[in-house]
């Protein structure tokens, strides 16, 4: 029995793949988004998150948000560093910032045969140039920057029609908010120039942003001591992915524990961890939670 109560949280829609943006549930809990905003997020078919929660019986009636003494989140690294260095545990000190964009280019649909190259307003050509631009933005700010075009919809998507409309997404990440802002500027300037050169109409919207998140020093130290108690090899690491902990950090002391994953692969069917890594992560999580629970009780009694 712990000195302070311990609860397990399972957050809805952490990835944001169907209902963008990511981490909506923890964001609502932390007050970053209001409840109506979260429930109104719609997928590509127009179904809202609220409707789907009702359909599967997951719509709750409890008030949103409550006091939390501390929050710890265990996760696979989703990258290769821990495995490459032979470390059992990643002591996560920070999470890098993110910006998500949705971009739509509108050109003119036309026949692929009779339409001369010089007169085309090819929306897909514009998107292709932006993909190259996004890659360059990331490479120019390496090794810490990440820049990805991960989703694309082409209309009319016919082999003999010049695409008249293309929708696609951009994902920027960096641990320095100033660099992230510079990446944002480079994207906006580049997109406008590409659209102008080809004669396209442009819609660009940033749909998701959070600044780099430093985790609570006392919670990070609890993770570090947990690794030492278990005799596990460990190193400090910055999270390259977004996690619910990033929003919980706005309302309570927070830290994360990483374990390795095979070949650093994640978001793939072959994602895998070894049992001894999971065991190590579980033991460190237990040590950190118990230590912080005792600390919280002692602080309340002072």
For the regions a language model picked out, list residue spans one by one.
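Flexible, glycine/charged-enriched surface loops at secondary-structure junctions
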Residues: 2-5, 60-64, 114, 136-149, ...
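Short, small-residue-rich loop/turn micro-motifs
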Residues: 12, 103-109, 252, 258-263
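Midchain, well-structured core segments that form catalytic/ion-binding scaffolds
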Residues: 13-178
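Short beta-alpha connecting loops at secondary-structure transitions
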Residues: 36, 173-177, 207-209, 264-277
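A short beta-alpha structural unit
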Residues: 148-157, 169-176, 201-220, 246
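Zn-dependent metallopeptidase/amidohydrolase metal-coordination segment
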Residues: 164, 234-284, 289-292
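Short amphipathic alpha-helices in soluble, non-transmembrane regions
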Residues: 183-192
């Amino acid at each position: 029995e712990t000195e302070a109560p311990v609860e397990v949280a399972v957050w809805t829609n952490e990835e944001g793949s169907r209902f963008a943006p990511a981490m909506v549930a923890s964001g609502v809990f932390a007050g970053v988004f209001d409840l109506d905003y979260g429930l109104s997020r719609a997928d590509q078919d127009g179904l809202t998150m609220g409707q789907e929660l009702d359909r599967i019986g997951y719509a709750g009636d409890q008030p949103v948000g409550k006091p939390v003494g501390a929050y710890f989140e265990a996760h696979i690294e989703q990258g290769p560093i821990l495995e490459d260095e032979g470390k059992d545990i990643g002591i996560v000190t920070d999470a890098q910032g993110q910006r998500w964009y949705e971009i739509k280019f509108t050109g003119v649909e036309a026949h692929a045969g009779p339409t001369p190259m010089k007169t085309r307003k090819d929306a897909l050509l514009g998107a292709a140039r932006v993909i190259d631009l996004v890659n360059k933005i990331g490479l120019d700010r390496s090794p810490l920057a990440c820049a990805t075009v991960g989703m694309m919809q082409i209309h009319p998507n016919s082999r003999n029609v010049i695409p008249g409309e293309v929708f696609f997404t951009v994902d920027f990440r960096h641990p320095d908010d100033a660099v992230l802002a510079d990446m944002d500027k480079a994207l906006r300037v580049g997109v406008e120039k590409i659209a102008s050169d080809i004669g396209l109409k442009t819609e660009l919207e940033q749909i998701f942003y959070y600044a780099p998140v430093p985790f609570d020093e006392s919670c990070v130290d609890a993770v570090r001591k947990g690794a030492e108690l278990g005799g596990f090899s460990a190193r400090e690491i910055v999270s390259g992915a977004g996690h619910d902990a990033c929003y919980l950090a706005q309302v309570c002391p927070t830290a994360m524990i990483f374990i390795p994953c095979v070949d650093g692969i994640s978001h793939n069917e072959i994602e895998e961890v070894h049992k001894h890594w999971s065991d190590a992560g579980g033991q460190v999580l237990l040590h950190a939670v118990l230590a912080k629970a005792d600390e919280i009780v002692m602080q309340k009694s002072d």
